[in-house]
Amino acid sequence: MNPIVKSFEYGQHTVTLETGVIARQADAAVLASMGDTTVLVTVVGKKAEEPGRDFFPLTVNYQEKTYAAGKIPGGFFKREGRPSESETLIARLIDRPIRPLFPNGFKNEVQVIITVVSVDPEINPDIISMIGTSAALAISGLPFNGPLGVARVGYTNGEYVLNPDVTQLVDSELDLVVAGTEGAVLMVESEAASLPEEVMLGGVVYGHEQQQVVINAISELKAEASKPAWDWTAPVQDQELVAKIKDLAEAGLTEAYQIEVKQDRYTQVGVIKSAAKEALLAENPEADLREIDGLLGSLEKKVVRSRIIAGNPRIDGREPDMVRALNVMAGVLPRTHGSSLFTRGETQALVTCTLGTERDAQKVDSIMGEYTNRFMLHYNFPPYSVGETGFVGSPKRREIGHGKLAWRGINAVMPSAEEFPYSVRVVSEITESNGSSSMASVCGTSLALMDAGVPIKTSVAGIAMGLVKEGDDFVVLSDILGDEDHLGDMDFKVAGTRDGITALQMDIKIEGITKDIMQIALQQAYGARVHILNVMDQAIGSHREDISDHAPRITTLKINPEKIRDVIGKGGATIRALTEETGTTIELEDDGTVKIASSNGEATKEAIRRIEEITAEVEVGTVYNGKVVRIVDFGAFVTILPGKDGLVHISQIAEERVANVSDYLEVGQEVKVKVMEVDRQGRVRLSMKEAAPKAEAPAAE
């Protein structure tokens, strides 16, 4: 075993890449470390392409093992289960920048498996996983146009920070991950605290500059440790067939792509493609249908792109910077705590907001530690939204990714727990889709939160942008359609307020996109965002003053922390009785904060009264209505407050001399008593005599 090792300093950490010792039967395996966080990345590709396949089957599996953090998994089986939301998001983060680096026409199955085997809770495994994946693909011999570099960028006190750790990110106004090759940025994923466009773009450029050290180190590792390159050549296009397809379909496709209604357009495109295929098969029954489909797809792409570059109107007749017609409604459902319906052209989201207590917050136990998530956003994409039938079940990777992007867009404006002590769950149901449903979810969420009375700092809107570039000519498109998304060269989604960006996601498919092009695109996105915000603010301009009648109202009060055990009672008996008898939910915190949640105001008042009784201090000189609980020879014990008894001595029962206590009092009798003294041991001395109203003294002669 001869390990080949490369180490370099990156930000405040040392990165080490090692190959040649572990997993030697894979096409490539790299053990990558950043500090104490270590991942094993393996790459395996099938040498033979499966006949009839018309897509590139790349699978990225990212798995966090609990042993990496020195933990044993919970649950009955005590082993790792299906991927968590965080694992799914990191798998997508790795997949997005490596996919465009495989050549067109490469259809062999490739599987990348990233296993987190050791973790430092201060160093998130995502960046080192991406570096390790880039290194493993670079030395695998697969036709991979890398290496790929990656950097996380923070922004604190006006300065960019390279690869901030978990603690530094808490105070950072930016969490941006940028991946790219030596000459081009390929992917950006970020959330920010309403930062200006130039700061966001500066972060992208800074991250791309800094990651060159990663690319250089992987290039050195490749020179020493690479497997022989695969003997793969791109399939050669049949130029005669290309010309025939152009003659048969170009004019028809050009006309079809001027039909503005999506389903009608799809029908007409289908008719033209079918006619072309029939003509070609009639001429040559042996023709390869898969090749014909591929060439028709390429022609379709070329037709749309050339129209856009030539300055013609877009597929649906719009100019490049136009946003589709908007229809915005808040409060559309009667019993939900907040709701909205946001429609932009043929994209529509029905969004609901539900308020809950602290107990409803999501508790996450990951290898990075335990944390609580008070704000949840779930995105659903049913098949009917695109006029199809399909499987309905647990969320797929794409739905989890889109939900997280919308969450990032909104999170920066959410109130703190002190300002708004509720857990919030938002669900976005995509009811129609033709481009950028995730950004429709951002707009719909902002509206639904305001409708629910959540005091968000300001409205947030999102917009999806596209770019078509041919040579030096380029056109930036605002509010792209689904068709423009898959045949453009860049798609990026921007969410934000009037003041700045809260989330930015970019996926770039070509080299040569300069900082200037990105700057123009971001400025155009700003104009579109403000236009959408103006329309949204007409529907609901600020959060409702009061929450829904159907939502639980949370009332907060403070008690002496030493009294918490009195409220809980022996074995939780007191608090259990309180919640059951009043129908409220009661939460206690160590600092003496008590949160009472109920949608019934009277029930809340009753719970407050009873808690105040339990926690009240006995005051000397105060008269209480008490209840006799025990009679003894020398007096009677009287309960004056829940859990607080005092003694009325026999001499303090009446003005006259009392021989037998039972002649005056019985158990269960209610009496007025005055507190005379509370001694050092907390014993309470009471008097009925002093509490009785005094008879008027006779008037002087």
Curated annotation (Swiss-Prot):
Protein name: Polyribonucleotide nucleotidyltransferase
NCBIfam families: polynuc_phos, PRK11824.1
Cellular component per GO, a single term: cytosol
SMART domains cross-referenced by the UniProt entry: KH, S1
Pfam families: KH_1, PNPase, RNase_PH, RNase_PH_C, S1
Listed cofactors: Mg(2+)
EC number: 2.7.7.8
EC class name: transferase
Keyword annotations: Cytoplasm, Magnesium, Metal-binding, Nucleotidyltransferase, RNA-binding, Transferase
InterPro entries, per database record: ExoRNase_PH_dom1, ExoRNase_PH_dom2, ExoRNase_PH_dom2_sf, KH_dom, KH_dom_type_1, KH_dom_type_1_sf, NA-bd_OB-fold, PNPase
Main location: cytoplasm
Domain KH: 552-611
Subunit comment: Component of the RNA degradosome, which is a multiprotein complex involved in RNA processing and mRNA degradation.
CDD domains, A to Z: KH-I_PNPase, RNase_PH_PNPase_1, RNase_PH_PNPase_2, S1_PNPase
Localization terms from the record: Cytoplasm
Disulphides: none
Annotated positions binding Mg(2+): 485, 491
Record organism: Shewanella piezotolerans (strain WP3 / JCM 13877)
SUPFAM superfamilies the record matches: Eukaryotic type KH-domain (KH-domain type I), Nucleic acid-binding proteins, Polynucleotide phosphorylase/guanosine pentaphosphate synthase (PNPase/GPSI), domain 3, Ribonuclease PH domain 2-like, Ribosomal protein S5 domain 2-like
PANTHER family membership: POLYRIBONUCLEOTIDE NUCLEOTIDYLTRANSFERASE, POLYRIBONUCLEOTIDE NUCLEOTIDYLTRANSFERASE 1, MITOCHONDRIAL
GO MF annotation terms: 3'-5'-RNA exonuclease activity; magnesium ion binding; polyribonucleotide nucleotidyltransferase activity; RNA binding
Function: Involved in mRNA degradation. Catalyzes the phosphorolysis of single-stranded polyribonucleotides processively in the 3'- to 5'-direction.
